Regions:
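A generic structural signal for short hydrophobic patches within well-formed alpha-helices
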Residues: 14, 45, 82, 119-120
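Generic structural signal for small/hydrophobic residues in well-ordered secondary structure
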Residues: 10-12, 48, 78, 105
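An amphipathic alpha-helix/helix-turn recognition signal
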Residues: 6, 43, 99-100
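ABC-type ATPase nucleotide-binding domain
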Residues: 51
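Helical cap/lid subdomains and adjacent loops of hydrolase enzymes that gate the active-site channel
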Residues: 32, 68-70, 85
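Active-site flanking residues adjacent to catalytic metal/cofactor-binding acidic residues
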Residues: 9, 46, 115
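Active-site neighborhoods of divalent-metal-dependent phosphate/nucleic-acid chemistry enzymes
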Residues: 2, 60-61, 72-117, 125, ...
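Short, well-structured N-terminal submotif of metal-dependent ribonuclease cores
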Residues: 1-40, 54-65, 108, 121-122, ...
């Protein structure tokens, strides 16, 4: 396994963090405050915008700007994660945004912080529970 160079936050974790929601664990807040490189994906911006438009969630229209203002780095999206999603057979019928975000984190040697029980159940060592 390659060394990890930072952390990628799942879309719901980004939104929770921005809102100061109690779902974000003290451990994750310490990680973010420690100065480790924190990344967000353009996939999260698209997912939040789409779900907000459909009325499923509330997300700020300037989400990317707010994340940049916090010092979070935008992780470039390449074709590698798009093909790597086949490495997770347990997610074949899961949300494609989630599969791509997970693949993007792993392909980029990042920890992936999520509260998605299906992803956490995969037992991947690079995946951390954002609520624990």
């Amino acid at each position: 396994m390659r060394p990890h160079r930072g952390v990628l936050l799942d879309t719901h974790v980004l939104l929770w963090f921005l809102a100061g929601a109690p779902q974000v664990s003290a451990r994750l807040i310490r990680v973010i405050d420690s100065g480790v490189a924190v990344f967000f994906s353009p996939l999260s911006i698209a997912e939040a915008a789409l779900k907000a438009r459909l009325g499923k969630i509330t997300a700020p229209p300037d989400l990317a700007l707010r994340l940049h203002d916090l010092g979070f780095q935008e992780l470039p999206l390449t074709s590698a994660p798009a093909t790597a999603i086949t490495r997770f057979p347990g997610l074949d019928h899961h949300d494609p945004f989630d599969r791509l975000l997970l693949a993007q984190a792993l392909e980029s040697s990042l920890w992936f912080e999520t509260a998605d029980k299906t992803i956490l159940a995969l037992g991947l060592p690079e995946v951390r529970d954002a609520q624990a």
